[in-house]
């Protein structure tokens, strides 16, 4: 990365591009592991949005006459790896769903931070079109996070807590 804000912006944009590509691979696995129909639906809906996020980033690259390419995003890779380890755990369905929500929200919070920075930098550099495109994605990431919060607080976390305290019965 060179020493100018534009260069840092492009570097961050490439990181976000790779993060979205990694999430396109991870979200179907998360949807498959989810047992709550609402959670499964939330992951599937966000997968569709994520394809749109990739397209928007490509539009930003094009608007700035920059090559469309990613840079491996170690941050999202680590978050996805943590999510994979959750899916390999032997837990009850409610706990699995609660843990999947937590993993999904970690990814959303990472993306919210990244897109917040990208929007601010784009505006500061006078890249209005890029800022608007990235703001649209930022708004969708915040909405996805809010939806996961509603699912967690709307019963999934309580069901997981109740399952943890229910007596074990022999089959």
Stretches with model-predicted labels:
Residues 1-171:
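Amphipathic alpha-helical hairpins
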């Amino acid at each position: 990365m060179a020493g100018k804000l534009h260069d840092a912006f492009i570097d961050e944009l490439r990181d976000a591009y790779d993060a979205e590509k990694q999430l396109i691979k991870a979200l179907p696995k998360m949807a498959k592991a989810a047992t709550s129909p609402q959670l499964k639906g939330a992951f599937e809906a966000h997968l569709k949005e994520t394809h749109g996020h990739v397209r928007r980033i490509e539009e930003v690259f094009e608007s700035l006459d920059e090559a469309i390419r990613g840079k491996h995003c170690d941050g999202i890779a680590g978050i996805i790896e943590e999510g994979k380890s959750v899916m390999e755990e032997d837990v009850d369905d409610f706990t699995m769903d609660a843990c999947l929500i937590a993993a999904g929200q970690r990814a959303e919070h990472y993306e919210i931070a990244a897109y917040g920075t990208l929007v601010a930098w784009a505006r500061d550099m006078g890249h209005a079109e890029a800022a608007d495109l990235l703001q649209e994605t930022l708004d969708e990431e915040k909405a996805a996070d809010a939806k996961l919060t509603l699912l967690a607080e709307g019963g999934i976390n309580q069901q997981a807590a109740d399952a943890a305290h229910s007596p074990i019965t022999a089959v």
